[in-house]
Amino acid sequence: MGTMAGSWAALLGHLVAGNDLSAEDTAWAMDLVMTGEATPARVAAFVVALRAKGETPAEVRGMADAMLSHSRPLEIRRRAVDIVGTGGDRSGSVNISTMASIVVAAAGVPVVKHGNRAASSKCGTADVLEALGVAIDLPPEGVRRCVEDLGIGFCFAPVFHPAMRHAAGPRREIGIPTAFNVLGPLTNPARPSAGLIGCGDQRMAPVMAEVFAARGGSVLLVRGDDGMDEITTTTTTTVWVVQGGTVTEESIDPAEFGIGYSTPAELQGGDAEVNAEVVRRLVAGEAGPVRDAVLLNAAGALAAFEGPGTDLRGRLGADVERVAAAIDSGAAADLLDRWAKRSTEIMRESE
């Protein structure tokens, strides 16, 4: 156990004095949040005091590990990649990570996507997949079958993390971003070894990268320099490259890959039906700013899966061509169609 674990008063006093906690301390606190033993006041005090001090990688890792220990397990037998952002970047953009997931799987790399309904936007991953006919709330065995059969599956956060309901009230009432906002990408129940992970919060992005490094994953942690929680096409993107337990920081520019700059308005989304239509047009081969953004993010996920190595730009350039081919061959459209049908069949069988 950590030095503070066992006493809320000691733990909160330590934080308020500006001192860091150990991973064991935050895991102890998170464990009580997940079991419902922590009162709403203690939940709120804990995450607000952490935010005021500034969360460390060890503190966030302790929370994420405790959350995973309470999740419903999902064993995927294949290496896979996750493509997900923290959300909350207020950009109101189309579902770029969702589209990139479909394209990456169509290019032959297994994807296990972790996500939820919209929090700050009009349309989250779950909302757009539901509008596309994908059964979003499959149990663990159903998600596993989807990945085995199709190379893609979606873990709906409320299905896999039911214990997080105890934090819902305090999260909503606090109304400011806290460590809870970055836990989603760190708690994919399939625990994929690779990821393209977006974080719009400039201070938290390198903290998240260090958590992934401590786990030994191969991850590109990205933040658009416009504040988007993905690789942006409106300007440059900062990339924290996580491989071999270390983190290095790079900057990439869409122009390096023959992609022109777009405006935020060109990536603007709407409700689930509007964004679903954008997905359909993307997989049908429509050119333009949305495709450009999807290609870069899909290439980033492939690079993370393959291991970015020492030449990130060279890797991304080759992968942009590979993911473009997955759209233009019709493979992405075919996969989306099969995913909707197969997930619905599996859902019926598991009812």
Swiss-Prot record:
Biochemical pathway: Amino-acid biosynthesis; L-tryptophan biosynthesis; L-tryptophan from chorismate: step 2/5
Residues bound to anthranilate 1: 85, 116
Pfam families in UniProt: Glycos_trans_3N, Glycos_transf_3
Record PANTHER family: ANTHRANILATE PHOSPHORIBOSYLTRANSFERASE
Catalytic function, reaction form: N-(5-phospho-beta-D-ribosyl)anthranilate + diphosphate = 5-phospho-alpha-D-ribose 1-diphosphate + anthranilate
Positions with a binding annotation for 5-phospho-alpha-D-ribose 1-diphosphate: 85, 88-89, 93, 95-98, 113-121, 125
Cofactor(s) needed for function: Mg(2+)
Domain of life (superkingdom): Bacteria
Family according to the record: Belongs to the anthranilate phosphoribosyltransferase family.
One annotated GO biological process: L-tryptophan biosynthetic process
HAMAP family listed in its UniProt record: TrpD
Function text: Catalyzes the transfer of the phosphoribosyl group of 5-phosphorylribose-1-pyrophosphate (PRPP) to anthranilate to yield N-(5'-phosphoribosyl)-anthranilate (PRA).
Transmembrane segments: none
Gene3D superfamilies in alphabetical order: Nucleoside phosphorylase/phosphoribosyltransferase catalytic domain, Transferase, Pyrimidine Nucleoside Phosphorylase, Chain C
Name of the protein in question: Anthranilate phosphoribosyltransferase
GO CC, alphabetical: cytosol
Alphabetically ordered keywords of this record: Amino-acid biosynthesis, Aromatic amino acid biosynthesis, Glycosyltransferase, Magnesium, Metal-binding, Transferase, Tryptophan biosynthesis
Entry's EC annotation: 2.4.2.18
Binding-site residues, Mg(2+) 2: 229-230
Residues reported in the UniProt entry to bind Mg(2+) 1: 97, 230
Organism: Saccharopolyspora erythraea (strain ATCC 11635 / DSM 40517 / JCM 4748 / NBRC 13426 / NCIMB 8594 / NRRL 2338)
EC class (word): transferase
Residues bound to anthranilate 2: 171
